[in-house]
């Protein structure tokens, strides 16, 4: 599916218990913030001019951020199909992460 991310919007963080998710920026600019198994935060930038495929394995928390003043679009792919009421997603929180820096 295509996910639209509004200017300065933060989607997430959350994790998927069973599926690996792939993100590919098709319009605008995005930052994917991922917390690895050791609690280290990684910020991966991508845009439509230099797109990269970003893979987030299951059980890792991630958020999508649009740091710009324009709408961005992200192609989101998964290796396991979504099913209603499967409780496969879990909201999370990066305790010491500075989310406010993206609102400036």
Identify what each model region corresponds to.
Residues 1-53, 69-104:
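Non-catalytic, conserved peripheral segments adjacent to functional cores
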Residues 64-67:
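Asparagine-centered strand-capping/turn motif at beta-strand->loop junctions
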């Amino acid at each position: 599916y295509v996910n639209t991310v509004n200017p300065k919007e933060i989607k997430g963080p959350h994790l998927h218990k069973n599926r690996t998710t792939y993100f590919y920026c098709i319009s605008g600019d995005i930052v994917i913030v991922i917390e690895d198994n050791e609690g280290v935060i990684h910020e991966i930038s991508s845009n439509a001019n230099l797109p990269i495929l970003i893979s987030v394995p299951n059980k890792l928390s991630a958020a999508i951020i649009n740091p710009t003043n324009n709408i961005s679009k992200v192609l989101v792919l998964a290796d396991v199909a979504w099913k209603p009421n499967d409780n496969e997603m879990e909201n999370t929180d990066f305790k010491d992460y500075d989310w406010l820096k993206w609102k400036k």
